[in-house]
């Protein structure tokens, strides 16, 4: 039985939304990867996924690496999405042979995450104007990202009832809907409390209509702050502080690296970051070792 690519992809995406409960961002990434796969199938004249061979799939990976100009990590993610599609088709009884079983993903060269110095982190935070509504908000966001190790998506979706400033902790909803309660630093707690008292009520008052947002961080119109806007806040603070190449994830990297430099156990840091594998967290230990080598060489 023929398995048309378009119908198969549609069915698979509906499956991951309904059955797996994946986040909107994750599903959107799957869709982009599989759109790329469908475009290649159109180019080579293949529509029946049941007839796709491992050799043809290897051609797709080569095309993605060479002609589509994707990085090794993007190719790996795309292959993972295609592999998920074929596993779904096999589970549904639509194919008898999975062409992805004998296909390996390209290896990714180890790229160490960038960590800011404490001095640069402070400079970014202090670049926010403490006398304006947005400056107070921006400082709270920066302090929270660095003081909790939260992902940017976790920060902008955080609700007021998830915060416990008395115990200085927050309940974060991470990838796959997994929840974890993590402590937040005293500076972050104070900055968020100042924002909740001095800035958020005034921003909320600017809301014209619609639902009252439960999210902690708001935009100038009183609505929930978007990921893109939060990214812009971090980038603007870095520019004001003269710190190049900074993203929200850089603050998360810095949180982890500084904890490990202070002697924290790698598995504790793994729990705080909400990472499923300690191997991912151990990358940060390489950063701290490299830094120790630099200090030793300079002494």
How would you label these PLM feature ranges?
Residues 1-299:
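Conserved catalytic core of the tyrosine transesterase superfamily
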């Amino acid at each position: 039985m023929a398995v048309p690519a378009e119908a198969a992809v549609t069915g698979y995406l509906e499956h991951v939304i309904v059955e797996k409960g994946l986040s909107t961002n994750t599903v959107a990434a799957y869709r982009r990867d599989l759109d790329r796969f469908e475009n290649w199938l159109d180019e080579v004249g293949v529509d029946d996924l049941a007839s796709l061979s491992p050799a043809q799939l290897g051609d797709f990976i080569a095309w993605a690496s060479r002609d589509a100009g994707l990085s090794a990590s993007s190719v790996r993610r795309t292959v993972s999405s295609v592999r998920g599609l074929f596993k779904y088709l096999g589970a549904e009884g639509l194919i008898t042979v999975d062409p992805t079983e004998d296909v390996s993903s390209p290896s990714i060269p180890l790229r160490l995450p960038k960590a800011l110095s404490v001095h640069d982190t402070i400079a970014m935070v202090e670049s926010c104007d403490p006398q304006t509504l947005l400056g107070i908000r921006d400082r709270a966001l920066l302090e929270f990202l660095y003081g909790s190790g939260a992902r940017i998506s976790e920060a902008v979706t955080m609700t007021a009832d998830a915060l416990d400033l008395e115990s200085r902790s927050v309940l974060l909803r991470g990838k796959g809907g997994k929840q974890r309660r993590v402590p937040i630093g005293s500076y972050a707690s104070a900055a968020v409390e100042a924002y909740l008292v001095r800035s958020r009520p005034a921003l909320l008052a600017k809301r014209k209509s619609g639902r009252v947002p439960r999210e902690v961080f708001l935009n100038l119109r009183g609505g929930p702050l978007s990921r893109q806007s939060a990214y812009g806040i971090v980038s603007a603070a870095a520019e004001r502080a003269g710190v190049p190449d900074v993203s929200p994830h850089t603050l998360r990297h810095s949180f982890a690296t500084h904890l490990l430099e202070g002697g924290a156990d790698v598995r504790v840091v793994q729990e705080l970051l909400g990472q499923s594998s300690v191997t991912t967290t151990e990358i940060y230990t390489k950063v701290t070792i490299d830094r120790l080598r630099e200090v030793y060489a300079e002494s």
